[in-house]
Swiss-Prot record:
UniProt motif (KID motif) ranges: 644-646
Biological processes, Gene Ontology terms: permeabilization of host organelle membrane involved in viral entry into host cell; virion attachment to host cell
Stretches for region Spike body and stalk (antigen domain): 248-479
Keyword line: Capsid protein, Coiled coil, Disulfide bond, Hemagglutinin, Host cell membrane, Host cytoplasm, Host cytoskeleton, Host endoplasmic reticulum, Host membrane, Host-virus interaction, Membrane, Outer capsid protein, Viral attachment to host cell, Viral penetration into host cytoplasm, Viral penetration via permeabilization of host membrane, Virion, Virus entry into host cell
Designated name of the protein: Outer capsid protein VP4
Cleavage, annotated site positions: R231, N232, R241, N242, K247, A248
GO CC, any one term: host cell endoplasmic reticulum-Golgi intermediate compartment
Family listed: Belongs to the rotavirus VP4 family.
Lineage: Viruses, Riboviria, Orthornavirae, Duplornaviricota, Resentoviricetes
InterPro entries reported in the protein's UniProt record: ConA-like_dom_sf, Rota_A_VP4, Rota_VP4_MID, Rota_VP4_MID_sf, VP4_concanavalin-like, VP4_helical
Coiled coil: 484-511
Region of interest (Spike head), residue spans: 65-224
Short sequence motif named DGE motif, residue ranges: 308-310
SS bond partners: C203-C216, C318-C380
Amino acid sequence: MASLIYRQLLTNSYTVNLSDEIQEIGSTKTQNTTINPGPFAQTGYAPVNWGPGETNDSTTIEPVLDGPYQPTSFNPPVGYWMLLSPTTAGVIVEGTNNTDRWLATILIEPNVTSQQRTYTIFGVQEQITIENTSQTQWRFVDVSKTTQNGSYSQYGPLLSTPKLYAVMKYGGRIHTYSGQTPNATTGYYSATNYDSVNMTTFCDFYIIPRSEESKCTEYINNGLPPIQNTRNIVPLALSARNVIPLKAQSNEDIVVSKTSLWKEMQYNRDITIRFKFANSIVKSGGLGYKWSEISFKPANYQYTYMRDGEEVTAHTTCSVNGMNDFSFNGGSLPTDFVISRYEVIKENSYVYIDYWDDSQAFRNMVYVRSLAANLNSVTCAGGDYNFALPVGQWPYMTGGAVSLHSAGVTLSTQFTDFVSLNSLRFRFRLAVEEPSFAIMRTRVSGLYGLPAANPNNGREYYEIAGRFSLISLVPSNDNYQTPIANSVTVRQDLERQLGELREEFNALSQEIAMSQLIDLALLPLDMFSMFSGIKSTIDAAKSIATNVMKKFKRSSLASSVSTLTDSLSDAASSVSRGSSIRSVGSSVSAWTDVSIQITDVSSSVSSISTQTSTISRRLRLKEMATQTEGMNFDDISAAVLKTKIDKSIQISPTTLPDIVTEASEKFIPNRAYRVINNDEVFEAGTDGRFFAYRVDTFEEIPFDVQKFADLVTDSPVISAIIDFKTLKNLNDNYGIGKQQAFNLLRSDPRVLREFINQNNPIIRNRIEQLIMQCRL
């Protein structure tokens, strides 16, 4: 049978050249390496960020976690969190504006009953009543007063496991944290002259920009990262923050390796990204009171800037993804103000900026590895847009702001009017900021995000400073250009070929003759006859077979067989032992994980459909284990694959392994399997449909899950090539005898061929449907 091809792939039953095996062993060899970390290694901490290796520091990038710094007294900058890391109980920080706010924070150890303690706050000994009933968590308490000689009141306790606290001056307020970790949240105190509040810390501390508040909250709730992620290894004096360090050149080209024809170059670059948003505002027809659409669209921007004394010409394309659709309907009258749809970007949206410049780094950006980037954040604030109505006061949209935070970098291709450029795509996640936006003179107000009406607010561009580093494979001769075939990476070349091949394969489905297909499905196809359409020599076929197996052994089908071969019968018997539908669902764990893509439905056993669908995914493996004389879905799948390979003009040894593996998993996704018990048939499909019926009358009977599970264990599993719906349709229109029905139920190829040769429209349509399901 044609499905022998899949059996051979699953059982490795094919011959290979010894040279192929040696090459495979050589490429997968492992080597033990001993590293002496030296006397300065922080061996108590594990590395957490695996990057491209050394990327030189740059003054353009603001660190996320700046510190640690030693205890000191200073005026913290506005808009920066001061993350406090105390080691002992007591007063950890105090601050005052010397007018109407004296604020201090006290740390209390776990398991402290209510008692009075003496603390020195602003140089004066104060009696404070404290307690901490938690057995494991530390308690931070804010004590505050509004007059110099007043008494302290306690506010905003924070119960903390990591023993971290944070304070920030921003927006006329002093912000702190309260609640209980790992769910602590921010709160605030009002203060006049808040920007002049001096802070005195009595423990080590870090500085985190407000743009990274989410990181600060993560640290408060879960603790600091390993020491390798902090700026300093040991706490330094705060004055060290103002020292301009001597840094290595940030813009440099380093030869990583070199041969006679090729070399690997590491390019480190400081970059300035300038971008702007573009929008489209469309008015509806009529009297001029209605707008149909206000949307974002991609925006190109070209500019020059200086980098190390060199003028750089750069090009950016800004686009957005994950827009939120809003609308406003002022009424149904022709003179009522209406906006059918206006787009807003919020925290669930992304901004993509494709960047290219005329430096050497982008000249040969084809084969690239070890790509890394660091970028500052930027806030984008919207402006006003007037809706010019023919009569009456004009509504106008105003406000809205988001901040952009770097979320990754990939390779991309920019398409301009004249040329396509290999470039870097920087991805930014968004956070909503103040102010909110509103449509004035309407009821729409207090919404957050950046609307598309006026996203640039009169600015020519927004600007972000940053740097990137990459290693590129380029010709050793700098005058040569890297050969490129409309691709960005080596893998993308293959993806492009596979994409074209998939389109060709799917188009070939209509050229397959069904009578020939069934004849081919009955032939015992082996590995080498499968590939005869590509190469005629046996040696080449052996090599192709090896490559196909290497790819196929990582497929979900192969992995599910390897984990299930020994447990199929046990799984089925465990199903049959269940005493109810719910217990059946909870005991089918061995039947559920048919591949890494299929979720475990033992947690959702609310219907028979769920269980039968899950079991039916396993039936393909059971059918393979107990081969019958009838045709199965894999026979048709392999026959279609063979036919398409022979007809294809784009198939090659390079793309064949991917195509065979894809075909085994994606061809005929909607399958149904049946088991026969005397005159009763149980049929279940991967789509969750299930039927039980009698052979002689095709009358449906109640579906017994327990009986179905028992039959699956002991009886052959048969592919429902002609499913129940088709059988019933055939019987209602033509009438079929009991023996003929049994032959169709067993997927007898001789009977199927007879129906096809007679041009029976019902059977022919069913086979055509299966062929059309053989798509990639």
